[in-house]
Amino acid sequence: MNNKPVYVTQPYLPPLEEFIPYLQQIWESKVLTNGGPMHEQLEAALCDYLGVEHVALFNNGTIALLTALQALRVTGEVITTPYSFVATSHSLLWNGIRPVFADIDPLTLNLDPTKIEAAITPQTTAIMPVHCYGNPCNVEAIQKIADNYNLRVIYDAAHAFGVEDSGGSILRHGDLSVLSFHATKVFNTFEGGAIICPDARTKKRIDQLKNFGYVDEVTVVAPGINGKMSEVNAAFGLLQLKHMSKAMQRRREIDQFYREELKEVSGIRMVDGTGQTTANHSYFPILVDANFPLSRDALYQKLKDHGIFARRYFYPLISEFPMYRGMNSAHRSNLPIANDVAEQVICLPIYPSLSIEQLSRVTAILQES
């Protein structure tokens, strides 16, 4: 048996020879950044692929989150989830905004709409939910609350590339949706991100903000930032799109393999989507409860001892980090579900190049424990 390490994820890389022609075009144009032809082509291609009207590319998803908040002039307090990558809440603090944590739904692991309303104060200006693992939030319930209280909704959709509900792209919901194209994501540009914009006017403001606030050669209208994606990153994205169908199909097959092999394992719960969603299978999280022979951490270590490097996404909670734990909303009593899930979760390896032999190594450990 091959004992080569198996990591929780691995970037999808198309054949190198297919990337060379894109690089040759960049060398010939001598345009490396500032909205060059590759950048413009990728924005258009993503609009078509995702079924959205306007895409603003960024150099990474965190800068995109920061800029989205600036674009909507969000201030005060924003209700968000503690169960996410730290960039979600960091983007708020960097904008001088106070995160207010609300608990998550025990089934979807997304922000629980029934907990949002109680967290609203006169200082609340927005809600920032996360489509965790690419599973859509209850967008209708969240939007209803936002409408009732005149709040903005910015979705951290870092996990949700290509995800659709019955009406189309999940990215069409809220005021803005923010994507990450980091190397670990199902669609990557090495580093990168994007904001999905509802209209041309909003995209224009976002494009200005990501270019230091410039509107022309001599006019600056806002304190912007350098959030521009380079031509090399955009070119890689164009090539990646050509391979997405094959990569997504392989992820779907791996997801099905895990579900079939683990369905009889007592003490393991697989996180399911809504059932009305076109999923991207970006992660494969399981929850390890008291009926499993090993604790979550013991299973995590056993996998590691066998060369399988799963991850405890998301542990610890954002609310446990020093810059957040002193906040009233970060208290464990306010977040019982999120704390329980964080103590149980393991994400198993999932990426297109995984072989059946490697997958069987993973499932055998869970079956035999």
PLM region descriptions:
Residues P37-A45, Y49-V55, T114, A118, ...:
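PLP-dependent aminotransferase class I/II
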